[in-house]
Amino acid sequence: MYAILAEKPSAAKAYAQALNGKRQGRIYVAPPSSLLPEGALICAAVGHILEFLEPGELNEKYKSYSLDSLPIIIDLFQYKVVSDKKEVLQRIKDTIFDKRVKTIILATDAAAEGEYIGRNILYRLQCKKTIKRLWTSSMTATSIQKAFSQLKADAETLPLYYQAKARAESDYMIGLTLSRAYGILLKEQGIVPHNTTISLGRVQTPLLAEIVKRERLIEQFTAENFWTVKATFNNQGNVYEGEWFHEKENRIFKEEQAEQLCELVRNQSSTIMEMKEEMRTYQPPLLYXLSTLQMDAGNAFGFKPAETLKYAQSLYDKGYLSYPRTQDERITESDARELENNIQFLSGHDTFGALFPLPVSTLMNNKRYIGEVTDHHALLITDKIPKDKDLSEDEKSIYHLVVKRILAAHYPDVAMSHKEIITKVMDRFTFRSKGKELLSKGWHHIIPPTNENDIMLPTLLKGSEGVVTDTLTTKSKTKPPNRYTSSSLIGFMKNAAQAIEDEDRKSISNLPLGTEATRAGLITLLESRKYIEWKKNKVYPTLLGITVVDSIKRGSVIKSPILTAKWDVKLNEIGASLYNHKDFIAHSKKLSSVLFEEVKTYSSTWNQNGVERIKSESIGACLLCGSNVVLRKGKHGEFYGCSNYKDSGCTFNLPFKVLNKKLSKKQLMELLKNEKTDIIKGFKWKDKTFNAPLVWNREDQKVQFGK
């Protein structure tokens, strides 16, 4: 008999359905079949159910939050069960050690991280049974059954475990060492408040540095006025417009010069110097990888990357989409054959049925879409087609994007005619006219462009003459670089080569920051650390984010994507059995020590380099000692307390919640100012709900309910 270990309950359910299994208690039982002749027990983790032991649990010296305990170097990582996941691990243990089970099928996600999650559990339980690996990018019954018929040998995917292990352990040591070091030093020098959480990391810090760099460019930008000049021409009855240009410049930075140009050319004769006309074709876009889906969803719906991943993951869990955390935009011939079958199920769909029959019936033999893929092919629909009413609005938005992308690939190229006329006036001044005309709509039937209006130009003879009948100047301003949006931030992370110095950029043309699976989480992490904030889908660094970046030495590898580039090369080599994971971890330990020494030395220059100090925002005066009441951090989370607690031992604090009622900042400020609040609605005690003000009892020195 087999025991199947899934990464999450939804996957276990999908496996059970594909194998005609039934639920028995907290697991599924699949009957004997041609795929699994002895049947199977199916259990599930819930993602990561194990976590590293804290450094202080491994070594007493690391319990001390001091520079003397750094860097954190761990020779043998050990794991503990996540506090609320003990029951899950016990259920897995009971399943795989069932006396009937002879072979374990590791069926976690088909990627390095899935390998890491699954094998950590098996190693923790000291499982010595035979292991087989299930590898599938789709959760449809057909794909699952096919994967069970082609189980991989244990050794075939083991290198992916070492790849993920090397990354996790190295990131942990470097991240924790630097987070502690910078946190201690920034707080010691009074640059950040003592309740501030400071974190640095190989990927999060270069991303934050880029956001801060863009903000600085915007702040330092000085807008300039400029003018453009347009002329209207009449060439033997053919009227058209052109814009002045000289070499590559079409802007004039002095108004009087623009006006003079208008006066000079008005009513003057003109000559056609060049007349170009060509037909261009535009291929349909490639299929979606996660990043390109996140970019389009951000532009179309304002979704943050984490939201797009959430909805795509939900569609995958329900069996409507293939595995979403993919970096590939192509598919294999086998995938194309399956897609050819699945796409026909859309012909009866309320939204997409009218688009059938498709002009191109198959993607087979189309090298633009068909080729080798890495772990997972591009995002595809499955043979399970949902009705719009079965999806939430957000899920529907994502599903429709993916479907349209696939359908567009089954339409011909867009064909457009482009014209360009270069007109010369007074044998001195040149004007450019550009026109376009849609000849064949092609895949724009499926994905219309934002602006498809034709700009018609006449066909004129080179050397033919006309006259300038009118001129117009238009005033504009130079614009700073755009702030990053959720979409453009993902675009930057797909290739961060632009962020590195010119001499290094020559050798690195493609530099991804993070992976398809981690990018959304990295952006969310910066937000949770209060390093960035969002305003109308644009990202801004906070003062804390700027301070952290400024505290890092210029040129430090922790602030540059170069480190990630080098790591990715080696990590991929580990996954391909071309490099030893132990050598990688040894190098990471040395780097952790180097970066720790770097911050110790550089921190002495923070004052002279103008690293900005951040003061805690006060919400009022302490009712015991009169000092500021600020947001602080304790063992059980954040709370408002006296800022003078270290010097005077003042213990004053205010609760965030009273009887399950969350108090607003405004209510807490009112309490500090007036020693009472207005009536607050919604307190709950046992089965009753009541309304009451909060008051400060001076005698007992505590907050209580008033009348």
UniProtKB/Swiss-Prot annotation:
GO biological process, any: DNA repair
PROSITE patterns reported for this sequence: TOPO_IA_1, TOPO_IA_2, TOPRIM
Keyword DNA-binding in record: yes
Residues annotated as the enzyme's active site: Y323
A molecular-function term among this protein's GO annotations: DNA topoisomerase type I (single strand cut, ATP-independent) activity
Domain Topo IA-type catalytic: 157-596
Catalytic activity: ATP-independent breakage of single-stranded DNA, followed by passage and rejoining
Annotated region (Interaction with DNA), positions in chain: 199-204
SMART domains: TOP1Ac, TOP1Bc, TOPRIM
InterPro entries: Topo_IA (IPR000380), Topo_IA_2 (IPR003601), Topo_IA_AS (IPR023406), Topo_IA_cen (IPR013497), Topo_IA_cen_sub1 (IPR013824), Topo_IA_cen_sub2 (IPR013825), Topo_IA_cen_sub3 (IPR013826), Topo_IA_core_domain (IPR023405)
Enzyme class: isomerase
CDD domains attached to this UniProt entry: TOPRIM_TopoIA_TopoIII
Site-annotated residues for Interaction with DNA: H48, R167, D171, R325, R529
Single GO cellular component term: cytoplasmic replication fork
Domain Toprim: residue ranges: 1-140
Protein family: Belongs to the type IA topoisomerase family.
Function text: Releases the supercoiling and torsional tension of DNA, which is introduced during the DNA replication and transcription, by transiently cleaving and rejoining one strand of the DNA duplex. Introduces a single-strand break via transesterification at a target site in duplex DNA. The scissile phosphodiester is attacked by the catalytic tyrosine of the enzyme, resulting in the formation of a DNA-(5'-phosphotyrosyl)-enzyme intermediate and the expulsion of a 3'-OH DNA strand. The free DNA strand then undergoes passage around the unbroken strand, thus removing DNA supercoils.
Subunit structure: Monomer.
Protein name: DNA topoisomerase 1
Taxon lineage: Bacteria, Bacillati, Bacillota, Bacilli, Bacillales
Gene: topA
